[in-house]
Each structure stands twice: as structure tokens, then as C-alpha cells.
Amino acid sequence: MSLLADLVNLDISDNSEKIIAEYIWVGGSGMDMRSKARTLPGPVTDPSKLPKWNYDGSSTGQAPGQDSEVILYPQAIFKDPFRRGNNILVMCDAYTPAGEPIPTNKRHAAAEIFANPDVIAEVPWYGIEQEYTLLQKDVNWPLGWPIGGFPGPQGPYYCSIGADKSFGRDIVDAHYKASLYAGINISGINGEVMPGQWEFQVGPSVGISAADEIWIARYILERITEIAGVVVSFDPKPIPGDWNGAGAHTNYSTKSMREEGGYEIIKKAIEKLGLRHKEHISAYGEGNERRLTGHHETADINTFLWGVANRGASIRVGRDTEKEGKGYFEDRRPASNMDPYVVTSMIAETTLLWNP
């Protein structure tokens, strides 16, 4: 096994200019991630300099068997924390051979919104809090829970330490460091309210880069849990009952919100979000109705409510933002399995482009 580990960690840059590029894309479910690798003649830092590639879309639920070729367009480059050296991870989106985005390509429409001059001028910042649950591989039950049983009630686990309260920290810390190495603007991690559940935060990142970074951070997490023999779940309510669900709270601000008088701009933006509540909920993740119950630090899915420091609201404004009269707000509605391309671009569209 030591020889295998040595070969896995072999630094090919010692005797070759060639690099390995891992092309990554979102699969047919809209949540599964797929990837495959190719050799390139030398280091690349600009995604536009990377070749397009293709894959069998009939094997990912993204194309019929009789016309199965789907084309990958490289969009963002990150350093590869697994192969290291000059090797890279490449976030791609997917198109038909005719150049049309396939239905599961949510990046294309998001990029159009973020390319709008009115959106560019406002330099939208996002900070996304990605929650997830670690599961024991063969029993599909949270890490640290007795098989077929339950731990003690919630309370001791949030931001906890100790072998009886904190489960999976080695995975979490490995993911944290690997994400930093990759160039993701990961800003922190913490243990969550339900045992076996964790969170990492990405941002503040500008525009579509926030969504690219979340997808690559998810990819890195899936790869690390694969190595550890643990399953990661982004289900918004993995365990029914008196247990917290998993969300992807999305913090948002624009240039106008960050400047003097920004609090008034924030309130107008929140008013717009309230008017489109149903549209946003329908795009904020599968199974979110199991999570947004009005309990466990959530608002009811059918009710739009905002407030200062209120974690039972749809939109929360921080005390600092209220006090300073400028800043950001937090959309607490997105589920942990949301598509960040959809959520970030929809918030920008509603607050900056949509006129009631």
C-alpha cells in the first residue's frame, strides 16, 4: 500500500511539462457531479485556452442514446489539491454539438444575468453557507449516531468538541485546507446543530464566481469523503423529526447596499424578494418543504417574513447592518441541495433587473 500511496502522490512535474486537467460538470440529476481527466501539454491558467471536450450524455441522463454526445466548455480553473503540482480542476458547463446549453446547464443563463451592465455596475457579493450531513456508508445513517438509534437531543453539538459530540472533523479540516489550496474563497467551517452535520462558508465572492466556487468545493468534499469511506448528503432534511435540516443560507450585497444609505436599498430589495417568494421557493432546492416548517430556525415555506437578527425569518438582516445603515442581508430559504447558479443569479435578477 505504501507504493500505491507513493504513486498516487507522485509529482510528475519533476520530469514532464505535461499536466492533468480534471474536467468537472453537473450531472443529469442537477445535483450529482461527474468528472474525467485528460493530459495537456503544459500548464494552463486561462480557461479560454483549454480545449473543449465531450462525454456520453446518455450515461448521465443528459442525452438520448442515439445522439449522446455532449460538449464540455471549460469555464473556471482551480488548483488540484489531490494531484497538486501544476495539475488543475476545471469547472465546465455542458452544451449540445450545435452549441445550445443542455437543460441541466444552469450556468449559461446565470452568466447572461451576471453579464448585464446593470448587474456588473452593482458588483454583487455573495457569501454562501453550505450545510451538509456525513453518513455512515453502508447504513445511510449520520456519522456518530448509533446504527438504528438516535443520539441525545440537540444542544451539545453546535460548534462542539469531543469524541462524544463532534463526528467527522478530520474530513472537515481536510476539505477546508484542500479548498484553500484550490483557490476557493472558503471563509470558515463549523459543526452544526444536528450531530454529524457540518457547514462551510464560501465568500464574499463576486457574481458567478461564487457559484463556481461552491460547485468545486462540493466536488472536493465528495472526493474526500470517497477516500474516507463516508457518504456526504446534501438532503435538506436527512432525518425526520426534531432535528435541524440543512440549508445554504445566501448572504448578498450590492455596491449600493454597501455604501451610505444602503439600508434603504436593502429594504427595497427585500420587498422585491417578498413579491416573488413563490418563484424563488420553487427554484431553491428539492424537498425544501421538509425543511422550511417554521421550526428549527426556519420560516414556514408559505410565509415570507424578514427581520433583524431573526433566524426564524425568510430574510435576516444583521444587527451591524441595521446599526451602520449599510451592509448585506441573508436569504435563509435556499436548501442545502440548491443550485448556486440558479440561486445567486435569481437574487441578482429580482433585486437589480426585475420591476414589479
From Swiss-Prot:
Signal peptide: none annotated. GO terms for cellular component: cytoplasm. Its main location: cytoplasm. The modification Phosphoserine is found at S2, S48. It is found in: Cytoplasm. GO terms for biological process: glutamine biosynthetic process. It catalyses: L-glutamate + NH4(+) + ATP = L-glutamine + ADP + phosphate + H(+). Belongs to the glutamine synthetase family. PANTHER family: GLUTAMINE SYNTHETASE (PTHR20852), GLUTAMINE SYNTHETASE CYTOSOLIC ISOZYME 1-2 (PTHR20852:SF102). Low-affinity glutamine synthetase. May contribute to the homeostatic control of glutamine synthesis in roots. This is Glutamine synthetase cytosolic isozyme 1-2. The lineage of its organism: Eukaryota, Viridiplantae, Streptophyta, Embryophyta, Tracheophyta.
